[in-house]
């Protein structure tokens, strides 16, 4: 093997080795459990991955600028608990806030997004003005948000939150049945988020500035 071919092989192995490992693991899983490739299982994987895709889109912009956000997952958890307590059905006997009418879904989404934005703003201020590294800042924020989430969960009774408004259940858990394959609504939400972020990164001045920061 010539030096050039050896260098090309090592470059390919460095850049694409993870995909080879994933393919090997996938082959082992399929060999042990052939039902892994069933349409029902694939739809479940797609649904579960969609939530992570949405989170990853937010963190990806930070990674491009050589930052990170370890608190993203905890923020999603806090948003989920708050949203769940506000979107329970009115006739639910175990309603956390029995005097509260069921709030409109868009309003709750805006509320929890605002909470996430405030946490992100705090992270940004600490990083930009106090010169604390993103890793340390968001690690601390992650712990704090987890504590707030635990306190809020204890405040509402520390029991499973259920009995949601039917419109919210359909919004969050609805799907389109294509035979035995179920395409969940949340997958569509993830696709919309991907499209929005693609436009943001590739068609706006803000996105191009992000790319320039990464290159520099």
Label each residue range with its predicted role.
Residues 24, 28-32, 37-91, 125-132:
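Single transmembrane alpha-helix segments in multi-pass membrane proteins
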Residues 134-204, 211:
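Transmembrane helix-bundle core of multi-pass membrane transporters
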Residues 16-20, 45, 74-78, 106-114, ...:
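Hydrophobic alpha-helical transmembrane segments
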Residues 21-37, 152-153, 198-207:
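Structural signal for alpha-helical transmembrane segments and their membrane-water exit/capping regions
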Residues 1-16, 37:
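Transmembrane alpha-helical segments of polytopic membrane transport and secretion proteins
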Residues 21, 25, 51-59, 79-83, ...:
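Alpha-helical transmembrane segments in multi-pass membrane proteins
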Residues 93-142:
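Alpha-helical transmembrane segments within multi-pass membrane transporters and channels
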Residues 214-215:
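Conserved small/polar residues in nucleotide/adenosyl-binding loops
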């Amino acid at each position: 093997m010539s030096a050039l071919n050896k260098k090309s092989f090592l470059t390919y192995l460095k850049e694409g080795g993870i995909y080879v490992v994933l393919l090997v693991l996938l082959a082992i899983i399929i060999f042990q459990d052939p039902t892994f490739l069933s349409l029902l299982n694939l739809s479940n994987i797609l649904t579960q991955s969609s939530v992570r895709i949405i989170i990853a889109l937010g963190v990806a912009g930070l990674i491009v600028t050589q930052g990170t956000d370890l608190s993203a997952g905890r923020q999603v958890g806090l948003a989920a608990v708050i949203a769940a307590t506000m979107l329970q059905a009115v006739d639910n006997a175990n309603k956390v806030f029995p005097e509260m009418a069921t709030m409109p879904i868009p309003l709750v989404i805006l509320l929890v997004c605002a909470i996430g934005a405030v946490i992100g703003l705090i992270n940004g201020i600490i990083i930009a003005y106090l010169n604390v590294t993103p890793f340390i800042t968001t690690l601390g924020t992650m712990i704090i948000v987890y504590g707030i989430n635990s306190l809020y969960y204890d405040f509402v009774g520390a029991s499973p939150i259920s009995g949601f408004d039917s419109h919210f259940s359909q919004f969050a858990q609805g799907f389109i049945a294509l035979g035995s394959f179920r395409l969940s609504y949340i997958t569509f939400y993830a696709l919309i988020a991907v499209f929005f972020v693609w436009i943001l990164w590739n068609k706006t001045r803000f996105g191009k500035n992000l790319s320039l920061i990464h290159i520099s």
